[in-house]
A protein has these predicted regions:
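Conserved short alpha-helical segments that host acidic/polar catalytic motifs at enzyme active sites
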Residues: 1-250, 254, 266-300, 338, ...
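Structural beta-sheet core signal
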Residues: 4, 98, 164, 175, ...
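Generic C-terminus detector
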Residues: 257, 548, 561-563, 573-614
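Glycine-rich phosphate-binding loops that contact phosphosugars or nucleotide phosphates
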Residues: 296-438, 442-445, 525-570, 589, ...
């Protein structure tokens, strides 16, 4: 959620740190700060509430010299968003400075202990407790910074990614992580540190992903020293970044979200490349092929995810049960991990996360593994925690998704999970070969069909203006399109701040119908499908109560068009693939409403792209 950047080397650190913070803005934040050790050995901290630009303005007339520094964007957890609570934080003597992502659960116990030892606190944060604890350990045990960090973190309960500067050792950054991501970039006699690779890619493509409960010491012109908390030396594994700098630019679009919506034809092709082969009539997913027997003997699939990824899991549930004929449950990771679920070694747990770093999903994986389940990860970020923790998995390969509201990652997740369900079904012979071959052909047609939908962008922009007045919106769908209703409502909530709810259309009569009025727009997802006539009946019920209807229908449908105030069409496809098409108009609708309202589309208030705290 927060963002960490660090640099040590030959260049001036400040410009690199500020550029890195801008790269991390998509993660969500409410304040920013930087710490630098200047050539005279002074440790300077500058911070500001608001955007990184506010920090730049504040630091403009300050001493920002130095070739070593750390910087941070904060998303408030402990203490309100203000300059006092912003990171970095000094230690009591101002010898140390720290930045931190995560939550220290036992911070109050540690705080009271430190107060008894004469320490004072200037902020309300758990982070300040951590830097005071490290300084106290360093002083009382008479150890160096790396050892002090190791010893201090052994006392900590919770998740963290930290970076620490020591005024008395101006040639070293010490960092550590547990449950929150941290990556080191390797340059020529210099090192870069960040929460993810986006601030690093401009300078190097060689990285080390720091493991859980590992501490790394970075010094100029020396190899990184990586140890466990118990000081066991680890051998770093250097990876090559697949990310490119051009992927982090808007490419002529006004917002990253619009760029990412329009990228979906390409990203779906990328997700299918080498996996869906029409000539060979095959779906080849290596994560499935390498573990085929495990999938074929499983008695249950459990999908665990959060937010948009949970909606993708709900769609996949239909496909796993319809085609692979495997019972499937979909769980919120945050609930699953705490409710003592019954898990066995016969289960496959599919964990979905765009970032691969979602804290609750990682905790759910840990619980499932402890009970013997096989873990299959579906994520986008190569080398992420979920990718490294899972027994097997499948990358979505959509490239970096910068907009906080997920778009291209969602459709790729649905695609990959549908491909997996069909691959299992073919091996189990629970799908007719003719239908399987037909669906392979339809998968390949999806990108072209999305391009047709995107041609309606201007029309959606025009009628979106009419609905900016709305304070509440209901989204309705059935079957495979019910989770699309949930996703459409979430998109509108996230970026336009309009309250919206998704319901199964048949449930409208069990409560939501009481809300229908001229002031309550209703978005109905009504493509041709087995429940089409029932959806039409629902629309008639809305019309009878003077509700304003926006419908998503199959091309050529005149019946629903005549009942609707506004209609968006999608090309025909099989029911199991419809969500990949029907969600596109809802993404565009939410986007245009938010833009007309003047909302910050890419960085909506209070939201973070990667939820790395519980």
């Amino acid at each position: 959620m927060c963002g960490i950047v660090g640099y040590i080397g030959k260049q001036q650190a400040y410009p690199i740190l500020i550029k890195g913070l801008h790269r991390l803005e998509y993660r969500g934040y409410d304040s920013a700060g930087v710490a630098l050790i200047n050539p005279a050995g002074q440790l300077n901290i500058y911070k500001a509430k608001g955007k990184v630009a506010e920090l730049e303005s504040f630091a403009e007339a300050k001493d920002v010299s130095g070739t070593i520094g750390i910087a941070h964007t904060r998303w408030a957890t402990h203490g309100e968003p203000n300059t006092r609570n912003a990171h970095p934080h000094y230690s009591e003597t101002e010898e140390l400075a720290i930045i931190h992502n995560g939550i220290i659960e036992n911070y109050e116990v540690l705080r009271q202990s430190l107060i008894k030892h004469g320490y004072h606190f200037l902020s309300d944060t758990d982070t300040e407790v951590l830097v005071q604890l490290i300084e106290y350990t360093k002083r009382t045990d008479n150890v160096d910074l790396r050892t002090a960090v190791q010893l201090a973190l052994k006392q900590v309960v919770g998740a963290y990614a930290i970076a620490v500067l020591d005024k008395s050792n101006p040639d070293t950054i010490v960092a550590a992580r547990k449950g929150s991501p941290l990556v080191v970039g390797i340059g020529d006699g210099e090192y870069f540190l960040a929460s993810d690779a986006t601030p690093i890619v401009e300078y190097t493509d060689r990285v080390i992903y720091i493991g859980d409960e590992e501490v790394v010491s970075l010094s100029r012109n020396q190899e990184p020293i990586i140890t466990s908390l118990s000081n066991v030396r680890m051998t770093p594994e250097i990876k090559k970044l697949e990310l490119t700098l051009s992927q982090l630019e808007k490419g002529g679009y006004d917002h990253f979200m619009m760029k990412e919506i329009f990228e979906q034809p390409q990203t779906l092709r990328a997700s299918m490349r080498g996996r869906v082969n029409v000539e060979q009539n095959n779906i080849a997913l290596s994560g499935f092929i390498d573990n085929k027997e495990r999938f074929l003997r499983t008695k249950r699939i459990i999908i665990t995810a959060c937010g948009t990824s949970w909606h993708a899991g709900q769609i996949a549930k239909y496909a796993f049960e319809q085609y692979a004929q495997i019972p499937c449950e979909v769980e919120y990771s945050s609930e699953f991990r705490y409710r003592k679920p019954i898990i066995s070694s016969d289960d496959i747990v599919i964990a979905i996360s765009q970032s691969g770093e979602t804290a609750d999903t990682l905790a759910a994986i840990e619980l499932a593994k402890a009970n013997g389940a096989f873990i299959f990860g579906v994520c986008n970020v190569v080398g992420s925690s979920i990718a490294r923790t899972a027994d097997s998995g499948c990358y979505t390969h959509v490239g970096p998704e910068i907009g906080v509201a997920s778009t291209k990652a969602f459709t790729a997740q649905v695609l990959v999970l549908t491909m997996l369900a069909l691959a299992i079904a073919r091996e189990k012979k629970t799908i007719e070969e003719e239908l399987f071959l037909h669906l392979i052909a339809e998968l390949n047609r999806l990108p072209d069909k999305i391009e047709l939908i995107l041609k309606q962008n201007a029309a959606i922009h025009d009628f979106a203006r009419v609905f900016t007045y709305a304070q509440n919106v209901i989204y309705l769908g059935r079957g495979y399109n019910f989770p699309v209703a949930l996703e459409g409502a979430l998109k509108l909530k996230e970026i336009s701040y309009i309250h919206a709810e998704g319901y199964p259309a048949a449930e409208m009569k069990h409560g939501p119908i009481a809300l229908i009025s001229q002031e309550m727009p209703v978005v109905v997802i009504a493509p041709k499908c087995p429940t089409y006539e029932k959806i039409v009946s629902n629309i008639l019920e809305i019309k009878a109560r003077k509700g304003r209807i926006i419908s998503v229908v199959t091309e050529g449908d005149t019946q629903v068009r005549e009942l609707s105030d506004f209609t968006i069409t999608v090309p025909p496809t099989d029911e199991c693939l419809q969500p990949i098409l029907t969600v596109i108009p809802l993404q565009l609708l939410a986007y245009h409403i938010a833009v007309v309202k003047g909302c910050d589309v890419d960085q909506p208030r209070n939201l973070a792209k990667s939820v790395t705290v519980e």
